UniProtKB/Swiss-Prot annotation:
Protein's membrane topology: Multi-pass membrane protein
InterPro entries cross-referenced by the UniProt entry: DiS_bond_form_DsbB/BdbC (IPR003752), Disulphide_bond_form_DsbB (IPR022920), DsbB (IPR050183), DsbB-like_sf (IPR023380)
Membrane topology, Cytoplasmic segments: 1-17, 68-74, 168-174
Name this protein carries in UniProt: Disulfide bond formation protein B
Native species: Albidiferax ferrireducens (strain ATCC BAA-621 / DSM 15236 / T118) (Rhodoferax ferrireducens)
Gene: dsbB
Length: 174
């Protein structure tokens, strides 16, 4: 399968791509809720931040796909790239913490306690410091943790976003 076939498909159906990404993100969020409320897994602060990134991706992709204006596709793809890139970064950081857990728990407070107790400019950096909870692997599928699989999905969304951007920009240049 050549790159032109893929980009041609992207060019002919970008709204379908945005709809697919939005539905996939919603599906991942639903699965996260299932793991939390049915299986009983408690999300760590990094998991919650990844959920926020997925919500952003779902909203951006959904609104862009629902719009009939092709001019919005480039902006939507750029915003989707930023949101999914951020989510991939957080998932990669959590995966790294799982592979190389810190010797000492570096963040003892829970997410909501930090947000309620500290001003936002202090709470947000505390969230990204990670904790023993973030390094704990509670569930795996085919040898990958939730953070590993979330990174894979965010990576695929990043690639789709880049392909959409490249195709749109290359059409404007030529």
């Amino acid at each position: 399968m050549s790159f032109q076939v893929v980009t041609g498909w992207l060019d002919n159906s970008p709204r379908r791509i945005f709809a697919f990404v939005s539905l996939a993100s919603i599906g991942m969020l639903a699965f996260g809720q299932y793991l939390q409320h049915v299986v009983g897994l408690e999300p760590c602060p990094m998991c919650i931040v990844q959920r926020y990134a997925l919500v952003l991706v779902a909203i951006i992709a959904g609104l862009t796909g629902a719009s009939g204006r092709k001019g919005l596709h480039l902006g939507g793809a750029v915003l989707m790239l930023g949101s999914s890139g951020f989510g991939a970064y957080v998932a990669a950081r959590q995966s790294w913490l799982q592979w190389y857990p810190p010797e000492v728990v570096s963040c003892g407070r829970d997410f909501y306690g930090m947000i309620e107790t500290f001003p936002l400019q202090r709470a947000i950096p505390m969230i990204f410091k990670g904790s023993g909870d973030c390094s704990k692997v509670d569930w795996t599928f085919l040898g990958g943790s939730i953070a590993n699989w979330t990174f894979v999905v965010f990576g695929l969304i990043v690639l789709l976003s880049l392909a959409l951007i490249w195709r749109r920009v290359s059409r404007r240049v030529s």
